[in-house]
Amino acid sequence: MAKAAGLSDRRLGRRNRFSPSAKIALMVLKAYTGFSDRQLVEHLNGNIHYQIFCGIMIPPSLPITNFKIVSAIRNEIASRLDIDSFQELLASHWKPYLDNLHVCMTDATCYESHMRFPTDMKLLWESLEWLYRHICRHCRELGIRRPRNKYRNVAESYLSYCKKRKRRASRARMLKRRMIKLLEKLLSQRDGIHSEYGALLRYTQDYHKRLSIIRKVLVQEKEMFEGRKVSDRIVSIDRHYVRPIVRGKETKSVEFGAKVNNIQIDGISFIEHLSFKAFNEGIRLKDCIRMQQKLMNVRVRCVAADSIYANNANRKFCTKYGISTSFVRKGRAAKDEPLRKVLRSELSKERATRLEGSFGTQKQHYSLSRIKARNRKTEILW
């Protein structure tokens, strides 16, 4: 796995405390224990079993004190991660221990990001706060007066709005209009400072990225304020890649995070498709079957999937290649309908218990209920 990730020991400079294989083991330990980075380092210093698992020895007199080393390793692996090559490597290792390689079970789930529930007010206020803070910093560095605006008045109104238990729609709309107008003014004031003193100011790459996101937020909020629908909606300034995913569940109608279409082979799950934008998993059944056949080199004979996969295109594909499914029958019954009914029942029962149960196990015991990574690549690695 370390070779597949492109990790190697340094030939020059100070020797790494963690070897390439130890870095992979540390990430596995992180997911298994559910510890924070600081807690993981503390347990690693004092637990000989964790050290043996990672293949390192930490003397009590020289413990690891910098817990950010876990984050550095996570970013290093995330920048080199290739999910397909990793899964092919793991599948080749697990294949001798697996049975029923001809059965493909598939379903989609959402692994939520650890973020506050997004609202228009929160998004606008985060944009205003960041922009005003940087305008003040620019003026302080240049030694010029701050431009006049209504930031303090809007801040007081927003604080009063947040403290209210019952919020009238008319008051909320008035405050939203004021925040949109103020955001437009702050952007124009910032652009004015840049046009006059841009050569004296230094901007980072993160600054430009955050500024472009705020401009998109302003455009989207103006569109929604005028009653128009917005596609590809931004729900977080920090995690600008996250999009709302409508799930239609009783407890959570909308979720925010990575939507993943999984296949399961004898209890082992593999990622077929991952996206932070909503997608229709029903059209991906053919890709799931092809992926399993590529990983296991065994022809798929049975498919267990949810009703969303039971469209006409998938039914024709499975009929063409002689694949039995768990889909509810359409049309007249065949001669061997009792046997097919038993097979459909077994496939549906297996999918509902093992596949959907694995989602709960991952989220409860492997730190996937709320992913706390801070950027897109590390969130995929998590």
Residue ranges and their predicted role:
Residues 1-25, 338:
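Basic, short loop/linker segments at the boundary and entry of helix-turn-helix/winged-helix-like folds
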Residues 249-295:
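Electropositive, glycine- and tryptophan-enriched low-complexity nucleic-acid-binding patches
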